[in-house]
Amino acid sequence: EVMRSGGGPTVIEAEVYRFFHQNGPYPGSAFGYRTKEEEASWRARDPLELVAKHLVRRNILSADTIESVRKQAVAAAGDAATRLTEPDPDGKPGSRRIRPTLWPDPGFVDVGVRGDLSELTGARTLELSTFDGPAESKRFIDVVAEVMDARLAESDQVVVMGEDIHRLNGGTNGATKGLAKKYPDRVLGTPISENAFAGLGGGIALDGRYRPVVEFMYPDFLWVAADQVFNQIGKARHMFGGESKVPFVLRTKVAMGSGYGSQHLMDPAGIFCTSPGWRVVAASTPFDYIGLLNAALAIDDPVVIIEHVDLYATSGEVPVGDRDYQIPFGKAAVRRAGDDLTILTYLSMVQHSLDAVEQAGVDAEVVDLRWLDRASIDWDTIGRSIEKTNAVMIVEQGAVGTSYGGWLA
């Protein structure tokens, strides 16, 4: 009545009853955790039965028509079961099995875990090592805001959401500086409920009309949203056989040394790289951040882009006025050539590794991975370097149990 009278959207909470056990055809009373009287009382107010009675009372449908619809539904379900199953020769009397001819080919098992990346065909890519155009020095954190500004201006499909991103002059670090004022309908501050807004982002990504950029203020908070992040968003393409795109970008930051405690600092790379469906990128320079975020937003798979608080205040060369290029997919960057040792690293550990190599006088090859997940990592560059040096060191800040280096090794 509130909605009918123009009172606006209304939440209706309807309590319903699960009449049967978690699996199988038996009611809960058969297992002793419900009584038959309780089940009967709920059956008397079953919404399906009540709707049927209202339809008859209002002369919308007759009782005979409703019964006919019931029979049609039962017949359709029975027909489907007959087509899909057959008597199980090794089972109990009356048991059935899926027809062997209907089982999918084993080669189909990984179909749809990720897309084929055809959406990247023809993308304009740049590399700092070969860039010869006009350049300027920019702070890392300013570039984060600028490239998101460019994508928000370019497409109404891009929606940004997260805690405090609409205030504090661009969130806790300035990554969304000025964006809420320019795009008030698409830069959305959220409640402190990662499970809720991650799920919202996953839903609108699957819907196909939006490309959400969701921020987890700290990666440790992913555990609050673990079901949405790993069971829903990460697995959605596979669940639908690759037919449904999931253009979802998750931004988060490593905060080692920030003083916020062990619940606000983790490196989530190892966790995401051992979880199906996710692509993982990490930029160590402002130049690479532009290209990696643009690539992440172009890809129709869920992508987590990991940042680091230590990099936000650093500066680096970027193209003047160009925030539209991508970093080549699946390509690492060799930051220093060497013959004695291969160092595989990412984020702020790239510069730390370069500094350590110089201080120690070691002729090491430092490889900035950039693309971290199994399906995207540059195995060719890694392989060539290891063949040359025959020695490997993986440098990261992850915890031992969930470390990226442990997985990569």
Positions of predicted regions on the chain:
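Thiamine diphosphate
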Residues: 1-82, 86, 90-91, 101, 105-302, 306, 310-311, ...
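Terminal amphipathic helices with adjacent charged low-complexity linkers/tails
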Residues: 71, 75-125
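Low-complexity, intrinsically disordered regions enriched in charged/polar residues
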Residues: 45, 60-63, 67, 92, ...
